[in-house]
Amino acid sequence: MKPRHKKMAVIALSVSALTVAVVLVLNAFQSNLVFFFSPSQVAAKEAPIGKSFRIGGLVEEGSLKREGDGTTLNFAITDTAEVIRVVYTGILPDLFKEGKGVVAQGKMADDGIFYADEVLAKHDENYMPPEAASALEQAAKAQKTSLAQ
């Protein structure tokens, strides 16, 4: 092979290897990407059904109920405008309480219930996840606007 052909072969091989690496990285990133939705967005059908996402807001007062097996829980997450029912099987974080901030990760089913795989509670008295705080503010503004009309 001539030096020019060797150089072109090396360049072609390098570009091919780089393309494969980029495709693998993007594929891994896509499979681990989890979006956040507020209860209002979920109620408006903006969240995907059957795909994993996070929902955040406040645990609705009086909504926490344990099933007979002791590990399955039913509760509702609200952003003060909409309420989404959640089912979770597992051990809840110690700071999980009604009326407090929470983020749940899981999938929305066709029956309108969010089946959580993971539940995250706030970690101190004043903390609320930024996404959940923003969703609560937007819901409050929307509620004020609808009342004013």
Curated annotation (Swiss-Prot):
GO terms for molecular function: heme binding; metal ion binding. Coiled coil: none annotated. It is a single-pass type II membrane protein. It comes from the Bacteria. Its main location: membrane. Residues 29-149 are periplasmic. Heme binds at H123, Y127. It is found in: Cell inner membrane. Residues 1-7 are cytoplasmic. The chain crosses the membrane at residues 8-28. One of its GO terms (biological process) is cytochrome complex assembly. GO terms for cellular component: plasma membrane. Keywords: Cell inner membrane, Cell membrane, Cytochrome c-type biogenesis, Heme, Iron, Membrane, Metal-binding, Signal-anchor, Transmembrane, Transmembrane helix. Heme chaperone required for the biogenesis of c-type cytochromes. Transiently binds heme delivered by CcmC and transfers the heme to apo-cytochromes in a process facilitated by CcmF and CcmH. HAMAP family: CcmE. This is Cytochrome c-type biogenesis protein CcmE. It comes from Nitrosomonas europaea (strain ATCC 19718 / CIP 103999 / KCTC 2705 / NBRC 14298). The gene is ccmE.
